[in-house]
A protein has these predicted regions:
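ASCE RecA-like P-loop NTPase motor cores
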Residues: 7-560
């Protein structure tokens, strides 16, 4: 605990990270990638595993000092990339989450992921978010256009004048609900000249105190104690959802007119879809009666005529990195196919109108949005097919590998270290702190392996030398051309948990999964209680205050 609180601890770790990033400057492939970034060209790189890819991306971001977007196949891959980048960059880049479309009307809808997305979209648009990690699905989902977002937000500034009636009306149009006490995001309360509001742009609710029409004072407050915690000069009140009916070019009235046109068109058909007509007319009544439309996503194409995704918020100056290009294409195809399978039930049940079903862009369309940026495609193996809109101008190959863990076997690790030393490699072993380094140094000495403590690390190890330095990585790395090996304390000192005696299992003819990695989106699976469904992917959900990973299975006639 003392070490974690010491600024010197962070300085030592930062110096180790800087050494790791500078190591790549000795590779001609790295210099070629840096030149391609400066020229805004597309380049493909093969032979890079997960940790190697993150090493390259971190070094390129640090040296180019440009904003960056890292695109991964799904949320789990994005979370792994996020953790690796945090180890190299010293700070955790935000992750843009995917979200489920709300196409069925419901009494209450959780918009936690939408709030997080709205904050990040605004951060991208204003340049506050410099590095972003996103899954293919999160990036390709249709969303509020950038210009519309800025037109729908409210900015509060101390000293400025506001008409409270007009201000609260704007909040209602932005999707906020009026309550007596503000407890969650998307709520506001007005008591005399005091306005409490909880915007997705902030971690805490805001209390704005007015003297007449002038905003006299403003600050955050604790929703539990209702006490002010920090003063503010300016605050941004973002729309509370990605699809807000009032953000239609002609407001809610314009959306009602569009829905009425769809109803009239259906009634003129020989075989009108009565279920769809009922849905449309019911939503028109809600809009005209001022009732919140929780399933506004189904009218996204009407509310936002311009097809826009999170990619449109990314700066034209940003460096774009596509991770596992082949998997990205497969993930995009699986998402489109999965949604296509659900469309039949949406159309038959009258949930969606046939002309309003465009919610995702393809991988090729997404890549085409970055023509001005250029891009770098990272793959373990060379891919034969790249997006036509953004093909690589050059293909590079890197010789490097990710090192496996030793399963707690120090003897195996010692053999590898001796092999590296014998072959003239410089070995850098990352420890969790100086005390841990001293312990590891003693353990290696018992195995006749000489190692030097480097706290702080000011240089890379020389040929045949082992340095123990501060730092941590999810996995080790080997660069044969540079003759460097980077190992982690976790590889060397992990202890395996004692094995439990397996209970005898009943005989079954079912084929059970050894790992969920055996599944690919679109596979048919049999749930023990719910029957046959289609595997969609892994999804994180917050249950009882804890965030856990869950398997998502789609069934006919329902979302999941």
């Amino acid at each position: 605990i003392t070490a974690l609180c010491c600024p010197h601890f962070y300085l030592q770790r930062r110096e180790t990270v800087n050494i790791l990033l500078s190591m790549l400057k000795k590779l001609p492939e790295y210099e070629a990638l840096l030149s391609a970034l400066e020229a805004r060209q597309a380049v493909a790189v093969s032979g890079v595993s997960q940790i190697i890819r993150s090493h390259f991306i971190s070094a390129l971001i640090a040296e180019s000092e440009r904003p960056a977007l890292i695109v991964c196949q799904d949320d789990l891959a994005a979370q792994r990339a996020q953790a690796e980048l945090a180890a190299f960059l010293g700070s955790t880049p935000p992750l843009l989450p995917a979200r489920e479309l709300t196409l069925y009307e419901s009494a209450s809808v959780s918009r936690e992921w939408e709030h997080r997305r709205m904050r990040l979209l605004y951060g991208l648009a204003t340049g506050k978010v410099k590095v972003l990690v996103a899954s293919m699905e999160a990036l390709s989902l249709r969303t509020v256009p950038r210009q519309t977002l800025f037109g729908g937000l409210v900015t509060l500034k101390c000293g400025a004048e506001y008409d409270l009636d007009s201000l609260t009306a704007r909040l209602v149009r932005a999707g906020y609900s009026r309550t007596s006490l503000v407890e969650g995001v998307g709520q506001f309360a007005l008591r005399g000249g005091i306005l409490d509001v909880f915007s997705p742009a902030h971690d805490q609710p805001i209390r704005a105190e007015f003297f007449g029409d002038e905003l006299d004072a403003m600050g955050f407050f604790d929703p539990l104690t209702q006490r002010r915690t920090e003063n503010l000069d300016e605050a941004v009140l973002l729309p509370v959802a990605e699809t807000v009916p009032f953000l239609h070019p002609d407001g809610a009235e314009g959306l009602c007119k569009d829905l009425s046109t769809l109803v009239a068109r259906q009634k003129r058909r020989k075989t009108p879809n009565t279920a769809l007509i009922s849905t449309l007319e019911g939503d028109i009544d809600k809009l005209q009666g001022g009732v919140p439309l929780t399933a506004a996503d189904r009218y996204m194409a009407l509310i936002y005529p311009e097809f826009s995704t999170a990619a449109d918020y990314v700066s034209r100056d940003a460096a774009v990195f596509f991770c596992d290009h082949g998997n990205l294409r497969r993930a995009s195809k699986a998402r489109m196919e999965d949604f296509g399978l659900s469309l039949d039930s949406y159309l038959q049940s009258g949930t969606l109108a046939g002309e309003l079903c465009e919610f995702y862009c393809t991988y090729d369309e997404l890549a085409g949005r970055f023509r001005e940026n250029g891009a770098i495609y990272f793959d373990s193996f060379l891919s034969a097919q790249f997006p036509e809109e953004l093909p690589p101008k050059r293909i590079l190959s890197v010789t490097a590998k990710q090192l496996p863990g030793y399963g707690g076997s120090l003897e195996t690790a010692v053999q590898d270290l001796k092999h590296y030393v014998k072959n003239g490699f410089g070995c850098l072993v990352l420890c969790g702190g100086k005390r841990r380094g001293e312990i590891l140094k003693g353990m290696l000495a018992e195995q006749s392996v000489d190692a030097l403590l480097a706290f702080p690390a000011t240089r890379l190890p020389q040929a045949g030398q082992i340095l123990l330095a501060d730092g941590s990585l999810p996995a080790g790395m080997e660069y044969p051309e540079l003759k460097y090996a980077i190992l982690t304390e976790g590889q060397l000192m992990t202890r395996t948990a004692p094995k439990k005696t397996a209970r005898p299992k009943k005989a079954t003819n079912r084929k059970k999964l050894d790992s969920f990695t055996d599944l690919t989106p679109g596979d048919l699976v049999v749930h023990e209680h719910h029957g046959i469904g289609r595997y969609v992917g892994m999804e994180q959900m917050k249950v009882d205050g804890a965030v856990k990973d869950y398997v998502k299975i789609a069934y006919q006639g329902s979302d999941a």
